[in-house]
């Protein structure tokens, strides 16, 4: 196999590979023969169609598939021969076959090398593991808070305060020119308890019905609304209604009988299990994030530019799709946040975990994968359908395999570092500023 390697400043690594035309032609011929055996074409008996006819009918599509397979095969041979490890998905480029006399086809592949990265001083890393104690009183309070209550929102003629429900109309301007397509009426939200941009929450406090508020924000370069990207936009907000909450127990919740007591006991155990489960998920993720962050702080880890840009684009596509499917509001906070930090976290996690898997030669344990599938399927009405889907779906199998490998790698990390336990009560857990760790929240 002939190849030529080069390193471009901004485009990562490139290799040009030559595939002999005889190899391509032989592969095409084998595929045409295979098609002839299984396909019947009008005017010919099955298996007797001339190769020339097969070539005329299927040539273009078959050629592309064959060449695609050969490009991947030769590239994998190249990285195996050179003993290099790539990260991300390589990009393939077919060269124009201008010189028909050449005995080979040429194509190029742009790829990114796996970062040279060694985890050092891992035993010196210290992190905190939060253990949350939940008492019977905590669970009873939770049941009381979430039991069947009817919320009544009463209009008031008072200034807006936190946890009031406010209804607004808004429109937006760029350079004093109104962009009418983004006008919105009757948008309701609870102040200080919503997913909208912080500016709206603190600007609206202490204002009254019919007050008009202006504020300006710069839209992010990757906001789903392309028309607003990188622009300074002024919002004009008009307060239509202010309401305060009044809680009333429903008639159903006032009935005291044996059936209700049994229900409460069932609710008690269910809520207890759910609380423990959710707390464990959040505290485990918090622990894992600390570990990754500490490793990055102690080790130089340079993210490949191509991989970083690709991940930015992937995340932007996800956000845009979600924005469109949910018919989201341009005031939603998550669409105004920089994607850079989220992408860095994802890539740091990916690279570190892959390095642990590579260094320790970890492999996916099929027994653990089956346990994971059973656990996931138990959350569905028809668990067997999920198990059948797993057995048929190659992508799902790969996902489960990766989850199992990540679990093993993280377990190794946890055993290698110093973990200091912190005991919290439930109230401290609830009141902790998890806003600085939004990715943990369920």
UniProtKB/Swiss-Prot annotation:
| Superkingdom field | Bacteria
Domain PPIase FKBP-type: where? 163-248
Q: So what EC number does this one have?
A: 5.2.1.8
- Respond yes or no to whether keyword Chaperone is given for this record: yes
Q: What's an example GO BP annotation here? A: protein folding
Q: Which GO terms describe its molecular function?
A: peptidyl-prolyl cis-trans isomerase activity
Isomerase in keyword set:
yes
Q: Where in the cell is it found?
A: Cytoplasm
GO annotations of cellular component type: cytoplasm
Provide this UniProt record's keywords sorted from A to Z.
Cell cycle, Cell division, Chaperone, Cytoplasm, Isomerase, Rotamase
Give the top-level enzyme category.
Answer: isomerase
Q: What does the sequence similarity comment in the record state about its family?
A: Belongs to the FKBP-type PPIase family. Tig subfamily.
Q: Main role? A: Involved in protein export. Acts as a chaperone by maintaining the newly synthesized protein in an open conformation. Functions as a peptidyl-prolyl cis-trans isomerase.
State what protein this is by name: Trigger factor
The species is: Buchnera aphidicola subsp. Acyrthosiphon pisum (strain APS)
Lineage, uppermost ranks: Bacteria, Pseudomonadati, Pseudomonadota, Gammaproteobacteria, Enterobacterales
């Amino acid at each position: 196999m002939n190849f030529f390697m080069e390193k471009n400043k901004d485009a990562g690594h490139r290799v040009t590979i030559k595939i002999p035309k005889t190899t391509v032609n032989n592969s095409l011929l084998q595929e045409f023969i295979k098609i002839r055996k299984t396909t019947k074409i009008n005017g010919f008996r099955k298996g007797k169609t001339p190769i020339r006819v097969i070539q005329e009918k299927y040539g273009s599509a078959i050629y592309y598939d064959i060449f695609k397979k050969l490009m991947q095969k030769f590239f994998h041979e190249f990285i195996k021969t050179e003993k290099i490890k790539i990260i991300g998905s390589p990009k393939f480029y077919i060269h124009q076959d201008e010189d028909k006399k050449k005995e080979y086809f040429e194509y190029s592949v742009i790829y990114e090398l796996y970062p040279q990265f060694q985890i050092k001083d891992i035993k010196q890393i210290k992190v905190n593991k939060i253990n949350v104690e939940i008492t019977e009183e905590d669970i009873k309070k939770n049941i009381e808070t979430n039991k069947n209550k009817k919320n009544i929102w009463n209009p008031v003629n008072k200034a807006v305060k936190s946890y009031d429900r406010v209804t607004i109309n808004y429109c937006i301007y760029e350079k004093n020119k109104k962009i009418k397509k983004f006008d919105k009426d009757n948008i309701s939200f609870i102040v200080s308890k919503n997913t909208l941009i912080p500016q709206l929450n603190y600007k609206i406090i202490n204002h009254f019905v019919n007050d008009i508020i202006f504020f300006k924000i710069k839209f992010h370069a990757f906001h789903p609304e392309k028309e607003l990207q990188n622009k300074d936009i002024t919002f004009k907000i008009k307060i239509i209604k202010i309401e305060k909450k009044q809680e009333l127990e429903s008639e159903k919740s006032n009935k005291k009988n044996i059936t209700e007591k049994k229900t409460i006991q069932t609710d008690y155990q269910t809520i207890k299990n759910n609380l423990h489960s959710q707390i464990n998920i959040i505290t485990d993720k918090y622990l894992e994030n600390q570990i990754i962050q500490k490793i990055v702080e102690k080790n130089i880890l340079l993210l490949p530019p191509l991989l970083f840009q690709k991940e930015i684009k992937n995340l932007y596509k996800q956000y845009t799709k979600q924005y469109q499917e949910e018919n989201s509001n341009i005031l939603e906070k998550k669409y105004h946040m920089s994607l850079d930090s989220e992408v860095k976290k994802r890539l740091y996690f990916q690279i570190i975990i892959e390095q642990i898997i590579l260094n320790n030669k970890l492999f996916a344990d099929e027994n653990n994968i089956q346990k994971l599938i059973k656990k996931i399927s138990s959350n569905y009405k028809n668990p067997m359908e999920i198990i059948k889907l797993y057995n048929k779906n190659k992508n799902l199998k790969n996902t489960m395999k990766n989850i199992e490998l990540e679990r093993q790698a993280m377990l190794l990390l946890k055993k290698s570092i110093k973990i200091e336990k912190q005991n919290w009560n439930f109230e401290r857990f609830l009141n902790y500023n998890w806003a600085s760790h939004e990715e943990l929240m369920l």
